[in-house]
From Swiss-Prot:
Induction: Slightly induced by 16-hydroxypalmitic acid (HPA), a major component of cutin that triggers H(2)O(2) production. Accumulates in response to abscisic acid (ABA) and salicylic acid (SA) treatments. The keyword Translocase does not apply. The gene is GRP23. The keyword Signal applies. Sequence repeats lie at residues 62-67, 68-73, 74-79, 80-85, 86-91, 92-97, 98-103, 104-109, 110-115, 116-121, 122-129, 130-135, 136-143, 144-151, 152-157, 158-163, 164-169, 170-175, 176-182, 184-189, 190-194. It comes from Arabidopsis thaliana (Mouse-ear cress). One of its GO terms (biological process) is response to abscisic acid. Keywords: Repeat, Signal. Residues 62-194 are annotated as: 21 X 6 AA approximate tandem repeats of G-L-G-G-G-G, Gly-rich. This is Glycine-rich protein 23.
């Protein structure tokens, strides 16, 4: 009986020892394999999310310019309050100018001129217009309140209007024929004005 008990104890000891070295190592390896494995698919860089073209570049740049308050510019220009300019000019309140000019309240000018309230002409004329509008180099029609045909170099209009270099019909509130350098009918306009004597021939 004691011999059988001793053999059983030895068998249990050997079995436990073998199980420790075999199944114990498998459990450790499985633990490392399944639970401590690095996850490269979770830590990959995402080039489609971090492209410079998406996050680093703005959307309001380039050809055609911006806008907003005091805004943009560029080719074709912006607008807004006090806005743009550039080639083709802007507009808005007090707005742009540039090549081809703009308009607006107190607006543009530039090459090709503009209009608006108090607006001007520019090089090569364009319609004056608005309240006290004007001509520019090469003239253009004055207009607005008290206007009249602008004309010539620095032509005019406005209340009581006038001519300019190269003359043109004055105008204005009660005004007469405007004069200027090289015109026959001299004189100015003004409030209650009239025809005044000849100018330089």
């Amino acid at each position: 009986m004691g011999l059988i008990s001793g053999k059983v104890c030895v068998f249990i000891f050997v079995f436990a020892l073998v199980a420790e070295f075999s199944f114990g190592n498998v459990e450790v390896n499985d633990d490392k394999h399944f639970f401590h494995k690095p996850r490269p698919f979770l830590h990959k860089p995402r080039p489609f999310l971090h492209k410079h073209g998406i996050y680093k570049k703005g959307f309001g740049k380039g050809l055609g310019g911006g806008g907003g308050l005091g805004g943009g510019g560029g080719l074709g220009g912006g607008g807004g309050l006090g806005g743009g300019g550039g080639l083709g000019g802007g507009g808005g309140l007090g707005g742009g100018g540039g090549l081809g000019g703009g308009s607006g309240l107190g607006g543009g000018g530039g090459l090709g001129g503009g209009s608006g309230l108090g607006g001007g002409g520019g090089l090569g004329g364009g319609g004056g217009g608005g309240l006290g509008g004007g001509g520019g180099l090469g003239g253009g029609a004055g207009g607005g309140y008290g206007g009249g045909a602008g004309g010539g170099l620095g032509g005019g209009g406005g209340i009581g209007g006038g001519g300019g270099f190269g003359g043109g019909g004055g105008g204005g509130f009660g005004g007469g024929a405007g004069g200027g350098f090289g015109k026959g009918i001299g004189g100015g306009g003004g409030l209650g004005g009239g025809y005044v004597g000849g100018g330089h021939h």
